[in-house]
């Protein structure tokens, strides 16, 4: 038995008429669908049961044979085979055409495939196919030329002149004869000769024709198959007809299109039988051609065929195209069973790995499991009975449900799923009500809030799926963000506020200076009101649990607060006692300044000490990162839960409220504003006198008001009260920031007009005073623009992610080490003097290419090919090293993917990346997901030229699509010295002259451009002469691939870092490498490749290797930079490309070439329903055989042995630390 699910690759080709007939189960001769009286399919019609199979299982049309026992019998009365009705989804029919018809895809696409094969223009072809002109097929011994077009009149004249000496015809039959006459081998040989001498337009055309003729020759497709004698009819259940109430029918558009084809075909047959005049027959043939065109691709030529209400009918091509087409709707995005959705509400009582599932949803989702248990425990007699019990909701059902859902994780997903953290696994806990309960800490990963968001639940059914959900997707596992390796589950809002309030210090509150013997005593005193949470007190260190104090500290008394004692209880025991929010305290030890000798006057000592700042959101994040680094997943998730509970508890105790009295009045405000008005007046006077231009006046006015706003903000910060609830909220990072506060208590400042220009009229009032009508009106512009921007940005960002995923979906970690000897030299990314991305962040989690040596001592810090950890990265930077050569995705030699060493650490887990990790998809999500945070607009600074550099999302799109950038910089093509920069006021241009070793070049740059070089500078080729963005395609011509890759990486990082978004370099490297994986062949040498062909670097190297081994001359090529859309469409997989964009074009091309899809990427395998070749679906993991272990093998430990061993190892590690 062949396993239909096991195949290596998938091929597409043109179908010959014989092939179409062999698929068919019978010819459809009548346009009828079903009989409206009996509602049975008509014989020989579009739904005929003889052709397509029975409409009811195991029952023929006339009802003579019913039941399964007649399986396989063909009824002698109605001719219907007795079988399952689902064969109506797979059996095809056909229509024998009375005249050949051209296939619109091959005639109409750009370039016209038929036109290239016949060397005719598409216009000429159209005239022939649609019966406007005759074409000469055999000129005989006349003066006519082959393939010459003749009008009706010319044809008649020539017939009179030459009689039957020549053959000419019109319509698709003529084209078919011409295609049959094409001698592929001869044409190919002739074109190859032509190529040797041809140039320009002629050469391009020759290469194009050669390409297509070679394709036909190699694939075994006949060119004449582009014209069809017979049309397949797709199975009826794929174009259903359903009865609506009221006796009307709804039908698929395809049935209408097929009906028109059959009607016209039958009419044509009748006309031919009657020997009708040729003009009538021609007209009918043309109509048949148009009907078939509409069936295959309605609207491609002329006006589309419309149905009721002037709606164009959906043809076969439309069934595949677009978001609603077969590819994206049914193959890449399927609906799944065992799923539900509901509104989410917060579940603060949950553990990190739990979610609350409403009971009625759970019983529906886990129905089969519960039913099985009911039958197995003999509570129910059979499955039917068990189902009834569940539907009635009997008591024993709920007990069993509780047991069934234990240890059975479910997946929660929130749309839009922008990155892999948008789907996580949780263990369900049954809850009352109808809402799903979500753990508050995972909200950030999902970007969820509880204002009515909904989430979907999915149940992993089989053992493997459950194991994967538990091991890889459990929410407690997903603590780090894959885009930068920082924790994604930092506490927010109330949790931050609670911990902030808990760790505050205040002067002179009750109980200040008291001394306690241990924690419990201090906490008891607080609970009974003797000590305030924020009062500084003394505690004996010896009794503070097992905290790692130094010997010097152990003899002394620690000055801290009750709040901090409580806060430290949730920390791991090995952590230093956290008394101040500093890195030193977190990573080294509690600073000595908080310890005093026993017998000191503690209240007096406390009065001298400054107050310590409380722990803010950022500090909590650092604590979590440190816990993760030292203790890994389990401990971190427990610790997060403790932090969450503590935060909620103490934010409740704190009782933060906001009232109007909390917004204080700033008395200096009026004076500042009056001063600003005076300055503006002075500036206006200067403008009136003509001392400054209008642009300068505008710039200065804006500057004055911004200055006033900043001054007010500064005054507000200075007069801020530390116990002010609004200040506490913004300072802790719980909600809001200082600019919100300025708008409440200071002034709102300047607003943007609808065109993005800043208006000179400031809003002087703040929200406490209230705005005037005019101010209110001005401020609505900005608010509206904000809303529209966000909406547009979301769509743009989503589309960017889709393109990124498509281009990188087949990049998977394929092997351990590719053995490359190349590397990438990296340094900190700078913009002017400002560091955009420091070196240690770029080094972290990468493998070195060469060993790194300390510049002063000469000691080796790290050897070659070793992983750089946090500590090593810091050590390298501290040693003053500025450049390090590392292994990079750019220089990896692995085919169709990356190796472990070139990729380095997996940012999402903090450990080495595993073979099988789908790093391409992760990279695409990491770049696409923050896309919504980037700004939309191109910044236009008021009237200053040369400053319009695109930023934000448009710039990212510009880079990844490899477009010519706006505000392009001029680059030099030679390495040398700038010898002259001259200005020509007449032409308003500057000329820059560079003297290289061999030649001297002069570049003209616009007068307004800001120069980046000065006379006497030594510059390298590819260096920019002016400010602006470099065109990467130009850079590629001047420099090598690695320089371009490096430039693109720096540019992308710049955009994201300017917006405060951190992304790991390796994600951008993966994407950029995909843009540069193709080459264009310049000279084919002795290979079979055509000049100008685009191909994969790996494939090109293989072909050249074979040629060299055979003793031939290898081909030469040059690298090509493709934008991500273009790169996706150029992939080797036609399934992946067709499901991305331009479906018909991709399929047309693939069919002619008889392309084989090797099914290497993820998308292709999802489409055909195979398990994806990444992660556990990789061959090396699927084909593992269980090894037989001897009965009493010495290598088999019991679980308890292993646990004891691990505990001992951990203890050793801690001692070594």
Curated annotation (Swiss-Prot):
Binding, Mg(2+): 449, 451, 453
**InterPro entries associated with the record:** DNA-dir_RpoC_beta_prime (IPR045867), DNA-dir_RpoC_beta_prime_bact (IPR012754), RNA_pol_asu (IPR000722), RNA_pol_N (IPR006592), RNA_pol_Rpb1_1 (IPR007080), RNA_pol_Rpb1_3 (IPR007066), RNA_pol_Rpb1_3_sf (IPR042102), RNA_pol_Rpb1_4 (IPR007083)
**SUPFAM superfamilies in alphabetical order:** beta and beta-prime subunits of DNA dependent RNA-polymerase
Which SMART domains does its entry note? RPOLA_N
Reactions mediated catalytically: RNA(n) + a ribonucleoside 5'-triphosphate = RNA(n+1) + diphosphate
Protein's UniProt keywords contain Nucleotidyltransferase: yes
EC class of this enzyme?
Answer: transferase
GO biological process, any: DNA-templated transcription
Which terms in the GO cellular component ontology are assigned? Answer: DNA-directed RNA polymerase complex
What Gene Ontology terms describe what this protein does at the molecular function level?
DNA binding; DNA-directed RNA polymerase activity; magnesium ion binding; zinc ion binding
**What residues bind Zn(2+) 2, as annotated?**
818, 892, 899, 902
Question: Which cysteine pairs are covalently linked by disulfides here?
Answer: none
- Keywords linked to the UniProt accession: DNA-directed RNA polymerase, Magnesium, Metal-binding, Nucleotidyltransferase, Transcription, Transferase, Zinc
The note on the cofactor says: Binds 1 Mg(2+) ion per subunit.
EC annotation?
2.7.7.6
Record: residues binding Zn(2+) 1 = 60, 62, 75, 78
Q: What cofactor does its activity depend on?
A: Mg(2+); Zn(2+)
Instruction: Please give the subunit comment from the record.
Output: The RNAP catalytic core consists of 2 alpha, 1 beta, 1 beta' and 1 omega subunit. When a sigma factor is associated with the core the holoenzyme is formed, which can initiate transcription.
Give the UniProt family note: Belongs to the RNA polymerase beta' chain family.
Its biological purpose = DNA-dependent RNA polymerase catalyzes the transcription of DNA into RNA using the four ribonucleoside triphosphates as substrates.
What protein am I looking at? Answer: DNA-directed RNA polymerase subunit beta'
């Amino acid at each position: 038995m062949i396993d239909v699910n096991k195949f290596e690759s998938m091929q597409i080709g043109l179908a010959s008429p014989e092939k179409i007939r062999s698929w068919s189960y019978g010819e459809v001769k009548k346009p009828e669908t079903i009989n409206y009286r009996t509602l049975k399919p008509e014989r020989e019609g579009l739904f005929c049961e003889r052709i397509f199979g029975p409409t009811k299982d195991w029952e023929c049309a006339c009802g003579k044979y019913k039941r399964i026992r007649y399986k396989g019998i063909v009824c002698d009365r109605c001719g219907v085979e007795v079988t399952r009705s689902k064969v109506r989804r797979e059996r095809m029919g056909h229509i024998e055409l009375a005249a050949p018809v051209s296939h619109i895809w091959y005639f109409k696409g750009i370039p016209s495939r038929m036109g290239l094969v016949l060397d005719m223009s598409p216009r000429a072809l159209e005239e022939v196919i649609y019966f406007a002109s005759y074409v000469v097929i055999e000129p005989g011994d006349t003066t006519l030329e082959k393939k010459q077009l003749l009008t009706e009149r010319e044809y008649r004249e020539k017939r009179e002149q030459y009689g039957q000496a020549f053959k000419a015809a019109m319509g698709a039959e003529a084209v078919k004869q011409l295609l049959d006459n094409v001698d592929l081998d001869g044409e190919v040989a002739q074109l190859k000769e032509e190529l040797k001498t041809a140039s320009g337009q002629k050469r391009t055309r020759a290469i194009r024709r050669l390409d297509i003729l070679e394709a036909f020759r190699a694939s075994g497709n006949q060119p004449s198959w582009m014209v069809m004698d017979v049309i397949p009819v797709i199975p009826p259940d794929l174009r259903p007809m359903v009865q609506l109430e009221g006796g009307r029918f709804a039908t698929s558009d395809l049935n209408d299109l097929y009906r028109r084809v059959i009607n016209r075909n039958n009419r044509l047959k009748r006309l031919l039988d009657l020997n009708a005049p040729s003009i009538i027959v021609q007209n009918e043939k043309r109509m048949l051609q148009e009907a078939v065109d509409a069936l295959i691709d309605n609207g491609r030529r002329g006006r589309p065929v419309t149905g009721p209400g002037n709606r164009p009918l959906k043809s076969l091509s439309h069934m595949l195209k677009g978001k609603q087409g077969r590819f994206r709707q049914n193959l890449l995005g399927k609906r799944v069973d065992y799923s539900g959705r509901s509104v989410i509400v917060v579940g603060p009582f949950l553990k990190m790995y739990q979610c609350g599932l409403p009971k009625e949803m759970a019983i529906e989702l886990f129905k089969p499991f519960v039913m099985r248990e009911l039958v197995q425990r003999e509570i129910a007699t059979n499955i039917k009975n068990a189902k009834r019990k569940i539907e009635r909701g009997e008591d024993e059902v709920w007990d069993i449900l509780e047991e069934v859902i234990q240890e059975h994780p479910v997946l929660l997903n929130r749309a839009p799923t922008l990155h892999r953290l948008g789907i996580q696994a949780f263990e369900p806990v049954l809850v009352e009500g109808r809402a799903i309960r979500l753990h508050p800490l995972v909200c950030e990963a999902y970007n969820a809030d509880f204002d009515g968001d909904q989430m979907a639940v999915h149940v992993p059914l089989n053992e493997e799926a459950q194991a994967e959900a538990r091991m890889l997707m459990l929410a407690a596992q997903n603590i780090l963000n894959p885009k930068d390796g920082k924790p994604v589950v930092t506490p927010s809002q109330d949790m931050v506020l609670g911990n902030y309030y808990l760790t505050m210090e205040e002067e002179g509150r009750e109980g200040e200076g008291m001394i306690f013997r241990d924690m419990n005593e201090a906490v008891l005193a607080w609970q009974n009101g003797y000590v305030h949470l924020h009062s500084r007190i003394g505690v004996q260190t010896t009794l503070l649990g097992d905290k790692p104090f130094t010997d010097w500290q152990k003899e002394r008394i620690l000055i801290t607060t009750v709040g901090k004692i409580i806060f430290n209880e949730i920390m791991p025991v090995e952590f230093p006692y956290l008394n101040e929010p500093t890195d030193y305290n977190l990573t080294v030890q509690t600073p000595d300044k908080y310890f005093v000798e026993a017998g000191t006057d503690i209240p007096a000592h406390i009065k001298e000490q400054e107050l310590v700042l409380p722990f803010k959101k950022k500090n909590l994040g650092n604590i979590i990162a440190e816990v993760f680094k030292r203790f890994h997943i389990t401990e971190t998730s427990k610790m997060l839960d403790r932090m969450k509970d503590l935060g909620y508890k103490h934010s409740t105790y704190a009782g933060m409220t906001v009232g109007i009295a909390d917004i204080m009045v700033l008395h200096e405000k009026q004076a500042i504003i009056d001063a600003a008005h005076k300055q503006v007046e002075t500036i206006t006077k200067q403008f009136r006198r003509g001392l400054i231009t209008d642009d300068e006046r505008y710039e200065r006015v804006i500057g004055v008001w911004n200055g006033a706003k900043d001054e007010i903000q500064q005054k507000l910060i200075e007069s801020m009260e530390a116990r002010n609830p609004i200040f506490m909220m913004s300072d802790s990072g719980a909600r809001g920031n200082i600019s919100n506060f300025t708008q409440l208590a200071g002034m709102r400042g300047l607003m943007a007009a609808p065109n993005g220009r800043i208006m000179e009229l400031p809003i002087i009032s703040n929200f406490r005073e209230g705005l005037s009508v005019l101010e209110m009106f001005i401020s609505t512009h900005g608010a509206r623009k904000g809303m529209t921007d966000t909406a547009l940005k979301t769509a743009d960002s989503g589309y960017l992610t889709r393109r990124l995923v498509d281009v990188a979906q087949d990049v998977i970690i394929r092997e351990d080490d590719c053995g490359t000897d190349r590397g990438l030299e990296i340094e900190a990314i700078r913009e002017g003097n400002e560091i955009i991305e420091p070196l240690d962040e770029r080094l972290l989690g990468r493998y070195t290419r060469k060993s790194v040596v300390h510049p002063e001592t000469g000691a080796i810090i790290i050897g070659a090919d070793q992983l750089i950890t946090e500590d090593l990265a810091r050590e390298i930077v501290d040693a003053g090293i500025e450049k390090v050569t590392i292994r990079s995705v750019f220089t990896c030699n692995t085919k169709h993917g990356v190796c472990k060493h070139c990729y380095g650490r997996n940012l999402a887990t903090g450990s080495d990346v595993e073979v099988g990790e789908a790093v391409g998809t992760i990279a695409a999500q990491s770049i696409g997901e923050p896309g919504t945070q980037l700004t939309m607009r191109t910044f236009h600074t008021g009237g200053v030229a040369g400053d319009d550099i695109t930023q934000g999302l448009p710039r990212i799109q510009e880079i990844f699509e490899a477009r010519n950038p706006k505000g392009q910089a001029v680059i030099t093509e030679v390495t040398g010295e700038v010898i002259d920069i001259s200005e020509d006021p007449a032409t308003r241009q500057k000329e820059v002259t560079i003297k290289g070793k061999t030649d001297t070049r002069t570049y003209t740059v616009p007068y307004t451009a800001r120069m980046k070089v000065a006379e006497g500078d030594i510059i390298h080729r590819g260096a920019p002469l002016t400010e602006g963005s470099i065109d990467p395609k130009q850079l590629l011509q001047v420099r090598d691939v690695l320089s371009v890759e490096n430039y693109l990486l720096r540019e992308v990082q710049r955009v994201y870092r300017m917006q405060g978004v951190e992304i790991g370099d390796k994600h951008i490297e993966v994407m950029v490498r995909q843009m540069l994986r193709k080459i264009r062949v310049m000279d084919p040498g002795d290979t079979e490749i055509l000049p100008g062909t685009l191909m994969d670097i790996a494939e090109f190297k293989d072909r050249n290797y074979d040629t060299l081994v055979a003793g031939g001359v290898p081909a030469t090529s040059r690298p090509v930079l493709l934008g991500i859309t273009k790169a996706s469409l150029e992939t080797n997989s036609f399934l992946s490309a067709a499901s991305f964009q331009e479906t018909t074009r991709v399929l047309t091309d693939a069919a002619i070439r008889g392309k084989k899809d090797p099914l290497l990427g993820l998308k292709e395998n999802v489409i055909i329903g195979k398990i994806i070749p990444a992660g556990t679906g990789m061959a090396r993991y699927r084909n593992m055989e269980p090894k037989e272990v001897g009965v009493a093998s010495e290598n088999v430990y019991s679980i308890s042995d292993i646990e004891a061993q691990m505990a001992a190892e951990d203890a050793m590690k801690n001692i070594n630390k």
